Regions:
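Residue-level marker of alpha-helix boundaries and capping positions
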Residues: 42, 80, 102, 156-158
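Substrate-recognition element of Asp-dependent hydrolases with the DxDx(T/V) motif
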Residues: 26, 89-115
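N-terminal helical cap/lid subdomain that shapes the substrate entry/recognition surface
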Residues: 2-88, 94-96
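Hydrophobic residues in well-ordered beta-strands that form the structural core
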Residues: 17, 102-104, 179
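Asp-based, Mg2+/Mn2+-dependent phosphohydrolase catalytic module
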Residues: 1-5, 94, 108, 112-207
Length: 207
């Protein structure tokens, strides 16, 4: 296995188990906007893409609706947690000198309210969020922005994520991709690596 100097993480479904928060709040918004109750599996597409894009696909986007979704999602904050064992592995990687980053489709205010309190920000030198680029996953722009800020060679970087959008973003930017099987519900045939547990992250670096 190739060893990398930089390990970059997606947030939702990779670092943090946010599925209940995202999908339950989205279901509530759809109910409010349309009066319909959609089956949970029909909402899975919203995992890993910007909220605006999800609402546009559902044909219910407005800034007010997006703001309302953020408000409702915050009420599910107690359901969000770091995947078991992951914080310890991240600390080990950071202590060993591996450079860690985040590339996420979350907005900065959502991240600050729901994700930052989980306590892993101190390990990440660069955190790329939706406001940092004009194009978003699956486009390569967010990863390219990480590479620019970190001064990193794409060949020395691996992106860990849970969706096809993550893989497409990484591949388009010339970066290797590792599927976080502990949070992924998707088959990702083009993944370079398939990590079954957080401990498998330690195999990605010699540092």
């Amino acid at each position: 296995m190739k060893h990398f100097d930089h390990i970059v993480f997606d947030v939702d479904g990779t670092l943090a188990d946010t599925e209940e928060s995202v999908l339950s709040s989205l279901a509530q918004i759809i109910q409010e906007e349309t009066g319909k109750t959609l089956p949970r599996h029909e909402l899975d597409f919203a995992l890993g893409i910007p909220g605006k894009d999800a609402l546009e696909k559902l044909e219910i986007y407005s800034q007010a609706t997006l703001d309302r979704w953020c408000q409702v999602a915050a009420s599910f904050k107690s359901t969000i947690s770091v995947f078991p064992g992951l914080l310890e592995v991240i600390a080990t990687l950071a202590d060993s000198g591996c450079k860690l980053g985040i590339v996420s489709s979350r907005a900065r205010n959502e991240y600050a309210k729901e994700i930052a309190p989980l306590g892993f920000d101190k390990y990440f030198e660069h955190i790329i969020l939706i406001e940092d680029t004009t194009e978003h996953k699956p486009a390569p722009a967010p990863m390219l922005e990480y590479l620019r800020r970190a001064g990193a060679n794409p060949g020395n970087v691996v992106y860990v994520g849970d969706t096809v959008y993550d893989e497409q973003c990484a591949t388009s930017a010339g970066v290797s991709f590792a599927r976080a099987a502990w949070g992924s519900h998707q088959d990702i045939p083009n993944a370079t690596y398939n990590l079954k547990t957080p401990n498998d992250l330690l195999t990605l670096t010699t540092k």
